[in-house]
């Protein structure tokens, strides 16, 4: 991928390099398999490639969370990507791992075994904490116990329509780029993609041969988002498949059992695109 064509991503890589070489704290990267976390991991690989061997001196953990009630197609893809990242990242001290909820905190253990009511909108949502947040926090805490402190990289974005220049020469790392975690002591949060708009994400991922550093095809990832309803930021990549509408790529692939929504739109799209085995049993 040519970073000269994407100066925003080049600047993010330079900023990442500054943060990475600042200290010896290991990085923890949340990877869901979606477009944002895929881009984040791509840029981490690209950054590490620019370093000398002696500068690569700490672990980068790529962490995927399997709730055990994921959409089967998304789950399979996430596991495959996590494994490939670990395989191709060994030379950069990248270690991939899939984490799971404790058996007594799984969705079915809570719902059937403990008699929890089903999660309901607007705010009764115990599932996210038990299935995703707690397993991740447990891994973070264990890593802190072994290393003292950690830096957590997240692929969250403001999704602004215009990109704000990210000058790094005069930016402080502590308290500016790295923010103390609100709940976990000795954990610091770094959000390098904050200002990157949607169309830049897809333009970068689908540039050139559209392959990731771990040799997966981003065109397949793009196909998982096909058919998403248009939003404020229309993707400039509708021409990827002229037979399908342009998309924003904003969709969230939820759990197949989710009771927080009336209709699982992502599941419906998979069914409409031929995955009829996903149709609910009557």
Describe these PLM feature segments:
Residues 34:
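Conserved G/P- and acidic residue-centered "switch" motifs that form tight phosphate/ATP-binding loops
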Residues 1-28, 37-282:
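Nucleotide-activated chemistry modules centered on ATP-dependent adenylation/adenylyltransferase
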């Amino acid at each position: 991928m040519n970073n000269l064509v994407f100066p925003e991503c080049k600047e993010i890589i330079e900023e990442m390099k500054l943060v990475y070489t600042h200290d010896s704290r290991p990085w923890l990267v949340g990877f869901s398999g979606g477009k944002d976390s895929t881009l984040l991991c791509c840029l981490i690989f690209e950054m590490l490639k620019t370093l000398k061997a002696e500068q690569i001196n700490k672990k980068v953990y790529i962490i995927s969370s399997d709730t055990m009630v994921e959409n089967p197609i998304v789950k399979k893809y996430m596991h495959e990507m996590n494994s490939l990242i670990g395989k191709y990242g060994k030379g950069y001290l990248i270690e991939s791992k899939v984490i799971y909820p404790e058996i007594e905190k799984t969705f079915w253990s809570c719902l059937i075994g403990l008699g929890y009511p089903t999660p309901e909108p607007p705010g009764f949502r115990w599932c996210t904490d038990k299935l995703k947040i707690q397993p991740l926090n447990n891994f973070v805490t264990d890593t802190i116990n072994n290393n003292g402190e950690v830096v957590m990289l997240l692929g969250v974005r403001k999704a602004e329509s215009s990109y704000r220049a990210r000058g790094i020469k005069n930016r402080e790392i502590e308290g500016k780029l790295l923010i103390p975690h609100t709940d976990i002591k000795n954990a610091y949060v770094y959000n390098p993609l904050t200002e990157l708009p949607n169309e830049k994400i897809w333009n970068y991922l689908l540039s050139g041969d559209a392959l990731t550093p771990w040799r997966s095809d981003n065109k397949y990832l793009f196909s998982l988002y096909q058919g998403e309803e248009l939003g404020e930021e229309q993707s400039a990549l509708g021409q990827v498949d002229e037979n399908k509408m342009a998309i924003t790529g904003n969709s969230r692939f939820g759990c197949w059992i989710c009771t927080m929504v009336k209709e699982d739109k992502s599941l419906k799209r998979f069914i409409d695109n031929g995955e009829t085995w996903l149709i609910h049993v009557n």
